[in-house]
Amino acid sequence: MEKYYRHFKGNIYKVLHIAKHSETLEDMVVYQAMYGDKSIWVRPKAMFEESIERDGKVIRRFEPISEEEAEKVINII
């Protein structure tokens, strides 16, 4: 997986790890917000990688972005 992603709502996140759910062994993405209090989140990998429909268009929930692009946004915040 790439390191930085832009959520469809616009915020930037950094993927820290891929973990396993203890009961189901499902892959989980551990990721950190690059804004505010820099909260750490976990979400099923399948959901992290899925496409969603928004305003009649199918888009990725999290779009990979370059480290350079992420740094530009992070430095503005």
Stretch-by-stretch model annotation:
Residues 1-77:
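Mixed-charge, low-complexity intrinsically disordered regions
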